[in-house]
Amino acid sequence: MTLTNHILNISPPQTENQEADNGYCQYDEDFYNHYLECLGNYLLLSGSHNISLSNGRFQIKRDSYTHLQQQLEVQRMTEQDQVWDKDKIRQRHTKIIDYLMEIL
């Protein structure tokens, strides 16, 4: 049996709906240019987990992030408002870079 992992965009390239309640920030030009492919917007998941989540609402994704520390980190970061936005992506990006610089 082979276990396959995927790198998931927490904010997907396309969402199933563009309503404000989908749990993501507005996808403006700044978001596409600086946040969509940002390290802080990536998450490691099993292949089957990634496929099951697709481009769905953030709340559904968030509730499924229960296995790895990095998944639990996203849950903790969104406890108050349960929205994945530019500020949280930037915070997570900085935290990952700081950690990498510390161990290198």
Residue ranges and their predicted role:
Residues 1-104:
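Flexible coil/loop and intrinsically disordered segments
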